[in-house]
Amino acid sequence: SLSDKDKAVVKALWAKIGSRADEIGAEALGRMLTVYPQTKTYFSHWSDLSPGSGPVKKHGKTIMGAVGDAVSKIDDLVGALSALSELHAFKLRIDPANFKILAHNVIVVIGMLFPGDFTPEVHMSVDKFFQNLALALSEKYR
């Protein structure tokens, strides 16, 4: 679980990187679709799945908007993400293993874009946050 220190670290990092959330989301989603091509099946209705395409940028922005919302509601991730969990479980039918794959890509991009801020301590707290976020998104699958 997230300690008070983890929560403070995540909030402090988000305060620094939040203004570039759209860029982080687009890059992370583009990477996921490239490195893990099996994830493309969920987006087959998009005309262009290549990194940097309009749909990838748009959904990357949507994803990071939800991440920002989760950061602001870090004390109740299950409650904060309940509607998204329901959407992904019952309507979109996304395999919850993909939440961890996307989270990994977001972490990679944060490390690339903010190497000075992404210390091992920050990495650990951010990783724990995304593990908890993925778990909260998986809540409706149980």
From Swiss-Prot:
Signal peptide: none
Cellular component GO terms held in the UniProt record: blood microparticle; haptoglobin-hemoglobin complex; hemoglobin complex
Domain Globin span(s) in chain numbering: 1-142
Tissue-specificity statement: Red blood cells.
Any matching Pfam family: Globin
Residues engaged in binding O2: H59
Molecular function GO labels: haptoglobin binding; heme binding; iron ion binding; organic acid binding; oxygen binding; oxygen carrier activity; peroxidase activity
Annotated family: Belongs to the globin family.
Function: Involved in oxygen transport from gills to the various peripheral tissues.
Subunit-structure text: Heterotetramer of two alpha chains and two beta chains.
Protein name as it appears in the record: Hemoglobin subunit alpha
Native species: Carassius auratus (Goldfish)
Organism lineage: Eukaryota, Metazoa, Chordata, Craniata, Vertebrata
